[in-house]
Structures are given as structure tokens and as C-alpha cells.
Regions:
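N-terminal targeting leaders
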Residues: 2-9, 18-183
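Repetitive helical segments and hydrophobic/amphipathic motifs
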Residues: 12-14
Length: 183
């Protein structure tokens, strides 16, 4: 009887401590806003530092907790896998959802890419402001003769000039202008 009296409170204490430990495991703290901002900055840095990332590729991402979703279009399959690999290695990333689209190989699309590049970055107001960066801020995506302009420009006039220049290229079926204006 004496043993049972000692055993009963000990068992109750163990059960309470075990339940408390499980509660702490179930409620994992979400990354802080500062941690989320740090992770977003690191993801961006790693993506723009990829060796073959250029003006004909468009990479974007979304960070949700410790999961990073990669989106966009690239001209090389290796760039898709490289982007996923560098983001996986970042501290704080537990999962990478790589939704990057590899654009189809097409000599016609390649000709259009270079012609649109010359038209957009050959314009004096665009070349001096955007053309001399390591990775220019206006990205030119060509899929089956359809051009999409992605990136950021300083003002509405630059957005319109880029659109007009791209529309003037022979062989282009349509131009989608997704350029954003800085605020």
C-alpha cells in the first residue's frame, strides 16, 4: 500500500511533464519577421549570384515560414536545378518548391531575344539607366514568339519606352509588359 501511495503521485507528475513536453513540441515558434526578412534577403542574393543568370531569365520566389517557392522562367535547365540547390543550402530553409519553367529551345526565340535586347537596351534613355548593370533590371522572356518584359523601372515613361521598343521588333507576336514602376 505504501508503495502505491508513492507511485501514484510520481506517475501523475510524469504524465503532466510528458504532456507539457508534447505541447511545447506541437507549438513550434514561427520565424520572426526579422528572420523572415533575413531569409528573403539571402534567397534573393543567392539567386542573383547564380553564374548563368542573365537578362533572358526571370526568377522570383516566395518565402512562407521555412518553405521557399521558386518561380519564373529560365533558358537553361541547369539554372533551374542550380537555383533549387543554392536555396536548399540556406540556413532556415527546410523545403524548396521549385516551380521554375525551362523555356523550350528555339532558334527563332533566340533571334527574337537578341533583337528585343538590342531594341530595348539600344534606346538611349534605357541603356544609360539600366543597361550597364551586372544583371539589367529589365528581363526579356520569349516563349514561342511571345515576349514578356519583367522587372523594375524607375518611372512610367521607361516602362512605356521598353514596351514600344519590344513591339517594334520583327517576328514578335505579342508583348506582355509586366514591368513594375519603383515607388
Amino acid at each position: 500500500m505504501f508503495r502505491l501511495k508513492l507511485l501514484l503521485p510520481s506517475a501523475a507528475l510524469l504524465l503532466a511533464l510528458g504532456a507539457n513536453a508534447q505541447d511545447r513540441k506541437a507549438v513550434m515558434p514561427e520565424p520572426s519577421d526579422a528572420g523572415q526578412a533575413r531569409l528573403m534577403k539571402e534567397v534573393r542574393h543567392e539567386l542573383v549570384m547564380l553564374p548563368y543568370y542573365n537578362v533572358f531569365d526571370n526568377l522570383s520566389y516566395r518565402v512562407s515560414g521555412s518553405t521557399v517557392t521558386l518561380m519564373g522562367q529560365v533558358t537553361r535547365p541547369t539554372l533551374k536545378s542550380d537555383a533549387g540547390n543554392v536555396v536548399k543550402r540556406l540556413e532556415g530553409v527546410t523545403q524548396v518548391d521549385n516551380q521554375i519553367e525551362v523555356l523550350p529551345l528555339s532558334p527563332n526565340d533566340d533571334q527574337i531575344r537578341y533583337a528585343v535586347y538590342r531594341a530595348v537596351y539600344g534606346h538611349t534613355s534605357l541603356s544609360t539607366r539600366y543597361g550597364y548593370q551586372a544583371v539589367p533590371s529589365i528581363h526579356i522572356i520569349v516563349r514561342n514568339g511571345n515576349v514578356t518584359l519583367e522587372g523594375v523601372v524607375a518611372n512610367e515613361a521607361d516602362k512605356n519606352i521598353a514596351n514600344i521598343q519590344a513591339n517594334g521588333v520583327s517576328g514578335v507576336f505579342s508583348v506582355t509588359n509586366n514591368l513594375r514602376v519603383e515607388k
